[in-house]
Regions:
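Mobile genetic element proteins and their domesticated derivatives, centered on retroelements
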Residues: 42, 56, 77, 81, ...
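Polybasic low-complexity intrinsically disordered regions
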Residues: 31, 37, 48, 90-217
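Non-catalytic DNA-binding core/recognition domains of DNA-processing enzymes
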Residues: 38, 60-62, 77
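Basic, amphipathic alpha-helical segments enriched in Lys/Arg and hydrophobic/aromatic residues
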Residues: 250-299
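Major-groove recognition helix of helix-turn-helix-like DNA-binding domains
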Residues: 69-89
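Helix-centered, glycine/charged polyanion-binding patches within enzymatic domains
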Residues: 204-271
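DNA-recognition alpha helix
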Residues: 54-70
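Basic, short loop/linker segments at the boundary and entry of helix-turn-helix/winged-helix-like folds
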Residues: 2-49
Length: 299
């Protein structure tokens, strides 16, 4: 699926989606200088242009057509946008905005009422400021010996996408390294609530009998997860659904799982793989904003 390269088109859609998702002002007594709709659209454009707050303000000051589209009489100070990011990108508001992008895709008949095939995946993002932590692992057979292993913390994004349209229907943001398998249920439930799913595919990182049971029995979603996790063995898995994956693995449908990798590539290519925010919560907001920007650029 192609993405828009027009900042005017992106601004129009971002502005419209914000109007459907958010009240004009956060509080009746708040300063009525800029609407939340205008500020959200500007945050999307920040991602589109891959600029910092100061850089975006400079672009908007020179771009009268964008100001006209957003009904913006005065260009906000960059600190106004920084504060707006904290206020507009709370978890609840992100979900509301994500749901509105999905409805927008349905409105233009890009997305159907349900996803016949979806895929889960995760990726690490580049951060300019990364911290290290140390893990001490007791060496096997040595009672008081420890092995020190160094890891690099990085912003991590997990998502679910519709394989046909590349629209993202669910997201989780956090820190890596972390196992994918523990996020499967939360991410799948969120995505299924946003857009009903018929079949879900996922790589071996999400493989567990518990995840199959949750998808198939709790949500009534057909799950196809690569069963080749853990040490290689000739023994069949003991679980019903993991055994089915070994004996009757649907290679054709699972082959479409690469569409999620395409979405990750689109995100990093169009909106940068770098996360410029320095602290954890700002990084979470920036990753969520990339997802919203991706969907808006598609519609």
């Amino acid at each position: 699926m192609t993405t828009s390269k027009s900042p005017i088109n992106v601004a129009i859609w971002a502005y419209a989606i914000a109007k459907k998702s958010l009240p004009a002002y956060s509080h009746e007594k708040s300063p009525h200088k800029y609407t939340q709709h205008q500020l959200f659209a500007l945050l999307i454009l920040k991602q589109f242009f891959q600029e910092d707050y100061r850089g975006l303000v400079g672009i908007i000051a020179d771009f009268s057509d964008i100001r006209k589209v957003l009904e913006l009489e005065i260009v906000p100070h960059y600190t106004t946008l920084q504060k707006a990011s904290k206020r507009l990108l709370s978890s609840k508001k992100i979900q509301k905005l994500l749901q509105t992008t999905i409805k927008a895709a349905q409105h233009i008949e890009l997305l159907k009422e349900q996803s016949s095939l979806s895929a889960l995946d995760s990726t690490g993002m580049e951060a300019g400021h990364t911290s290290r932590y140390f893990v001490k692992r007791r060496q096997r057979g040595e009672e008081n010996m420890y092995q020190t292993t160094t890891y690099r913390r990085f912003p991590k994004l997990a998502l679910n996408c519709d394989c046909r349209t590349h629209i993202i229907t669910g997201l989780l943001v956090g820190k890596g390294p972390s196992p994918d398998v523990v996020h499967f249920k939360k991410l799948l439930r969120q995505a299924h609530n946003n857009l009903p799913i018929q079949t879900i595919t996922a790589d071996a990182g999400y493989d567990s009998e518990s995840n199959h049971i949750f998808a198939r029995d709790a949500l009534k979603i057909h799950s196809i997860i690569n069963p080749k996790t853990g040490c290689p063995t000739k023994k069949l898995p003991s679980g019903k659904y993991r055994r089915e994956m070994v004996e009757h693995f649907d290679k054709d449908k699972y082959g479409q799982r690469w569409q999620s990798e395409t979405v990750m590539s689109m995100l990093k290519r169009n909106l940068s793989e770098s996360i410029f925010s320095k602290n954890y919560w700002s990084q979470r907001r920036e990753m969520a904003l990339k997802v919203l920007s991706h969907n808006i650029m598609i519609v």
